[in-house]
């Protein structure tokens, strides 16, 4: 944790006092790794600063890397932690939780941003609490799952937009069982024609 804090402090110093006139990013720095570490320790300022530098680096170098908003990475990792953060649950389970959020963002049936999907009334329990909003830092496994999803990895079909402890919607696509938590079902929309 100390190492991460020092790295993030160094990034902030670099951004405040760039070594070369007009240089806003260092081509040698892996800003995505900084965003990941910032998400895992809840350092929003460092994560946003790294996002800005990474996007500028992508634009200036003509890279085909996917741009990722730090807010999306952080919020997606937080909801994955909230819904499937236990170490006893599989990476696949975590990926499915996050994928439901991204499938909803892409769906005509739900809001258009990660934040709006997560905060939509009646959808995710506890997201409007101080615990979720201010104190919950995502686990490293949840940040990894969120990153993989934002980079395009998928396990389910686009119409899988529900996650609950009971079947719902247009049918069960996948289900996971844990002896402590019981079943979690990942279910399709009742309107599959919207997804083809």
Task: Locate each region found by the language model.
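Bacterial extracytoplasmic/cell-wall-associated proteins, especially those involved in peptidoglycan
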Residues: 55-196
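N-terminal secretory targeting signals
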Residues: 1-68, 196
């Amino acid at each position: 944790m100390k190492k991460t804090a020092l790295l993030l402090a160094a990034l902030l110093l670099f951004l405040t006092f760039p070594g070369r006139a007009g240089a806003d990013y260092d081509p040698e720095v892996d800003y995505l790794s900084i965003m990941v570490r910032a998400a895992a320790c809840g350092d929003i300022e460092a994560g946003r600063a790294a996002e800005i530098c990474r996007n500028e680096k992508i634009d200036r170098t003509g890279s085909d890397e996917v741009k990722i908003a730090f807010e999306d990475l952080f919020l997606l990792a937080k909801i994955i932690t909230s819904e499937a953060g236990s170490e006893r649950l599989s990476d696949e389970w975590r990926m499915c939780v996050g994928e439901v959020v991204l499938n909803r963002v892409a769906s005509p049936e739900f809001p258009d941003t990660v934040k709006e999907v997560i905060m939509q009334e009646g959808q995710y329990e506890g997201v409007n609490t101080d615990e979720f909003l201010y104190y919950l830092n995502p686990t490293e496994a949840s940040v990894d799952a969120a990153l993989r999803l934002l980079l395009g990895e998928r396990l389910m079909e686009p119409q899988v937009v529900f996650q609950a402890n009971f079947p719902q919607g247009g049918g069960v696509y996948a289900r996971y069982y844990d002896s402590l938590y019981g079943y979690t079902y990942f279910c399709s929309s009742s309107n599959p024609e919207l997804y083809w």
